Amino acid sequence: MDLSTADLADREGPSVRSCDVQLRNYGGRAVFSGRIRTVRCFQDNALLKQVLSGPGEGDVLVVDGGGSVHTALIGDLIAELGRSNGWSGVVVHGAVRDSAVLAGMEFGVKALGTNPRKSTKTGEGVLDEVVSFGGVDFVPGEHLVSDTDGIVVVASAD
């Protein structure tokens, strides 16, 4: 999608679905978009690693980590899995780590903050269900656009 989040907000008007949570850019690609896939997990990244290990086809993985910054859900190794498997980027309602490496990676990464502490790896979590944060429902199959102004979700890429 070639429209910026500001242009999408103007087009959608008062009904625009823009994320109110102020997520920071950590990846080397500040502008990214794609079809939404979702993971809900809390301080455990095994499931999202599994998802990013598969073909991304330009999709964006939205991770609802419950807003916890106690442990990082994504670091350089998992981000590289996503990048090399064709994912456009990840949006994490939680923390990341290896931020200096992420900044040099041609991959979109947005998150609440950083923490060097690694997460558990039990595989707890849920795939491809609607996740909600920042006043937005992230619906699998809908389209997400992320840039330096924020995140907007639209029903389709048209």
Swiss-Prot record:
Protein name from the UniProt record: Putative 4-hydroxy-4-methyl-2-oxoglutarate aldolase
Record carries keyword Metal-binding: yes
Cofactors required: a divalent metal cation
GO terms of biological process kind: regulation of RNA metabolic process
Top-level taxonomy: Bacteria, Bacillati, Actinomycetota, Actinomycetes, Pseudonocardiales
SUPFAM superfamilies according to UniProt: RraA-like
Positions in coiled-coil regions: none
Organism, as annotated: Saccharopolyspora erythraea (strain ATCC 11635 / DSM 40517 / JCM 4748 / NBRC 13426 / NCIMB 8594 / NRRL 2338)
Function: Catalyzes the aldol cleavage of 4-hydroxy-4-methyl-2-oxoglutarate (HMG) into 2 molecules of pyruvate. Also contains a secondary oxaloacetate (OAA) decarboxylase activity due to the common pyruvate enolate transition state formed following C-C bond cleavage in the retro-aldol and decarboxylation reactions.
Family: Belongs to the class II aldolase/RraA-like family.
